[in-house]
């Protein structure tokens, strides 16, 4: 049975999810240390070993098969695996390591991290603000809860607009908290529960060679290029595979 590529592309345009596709490029840092590992001090990749260049575009994809299995005692603790399969047009062929962000989807993320030296700090994912309808009306939500460390134990709660703000790139800006003396000091830990858009990294080599032969309404067979499918994993869970 031949695949009707025109029908697939038409359905993809009407029912596929909007995905921001960012091409990932290996960073050349780390050579000065004599190691293949990326340099933590690299101003381009920040130690991840990857940079995202100007090759960014919005595409449509069918996203299926979200798995979230918790494997206890694996790697000395719980390890969550969140993977999806994305199918897209043949001319859209992501490579291993590329970032795929669902533009119209959101999820909640709980994170504990350390305050950086500068006033602006990026979390695992960019903080996103959404409108939520309640019994009393529509409210905006982005950071749902945050708490700082104090002398090694849980300290006071942190409030948006009082202790920090969120910039246009979805990063935390500690400037007002630093001025008031309520923000975590550099090196101190804090926990934050926030809303973000799911960002995935491609962890399989795509089916760029998935082609077939057809002979529909033709005396001779011809080559048919079929849709591309890739396996992706939530970015913070995929970094172990991408190092």
Q: What are the language-model segments listed below?
A:
Residues 1-78, 201-243:
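N-terminal disorder-to-order initiation segments that are Gly/Lys/Arg-biased
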Residues 68-70, 99, 107-109:
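A general sequence property marking short-to-moderate contiguous segments
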Residues 56, 79-83, 187:
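A general secondary-structure signal for short beta-strands and their flanking turns/coil
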Residues 101-102, 191:
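Hydrophobic beta-strand signal
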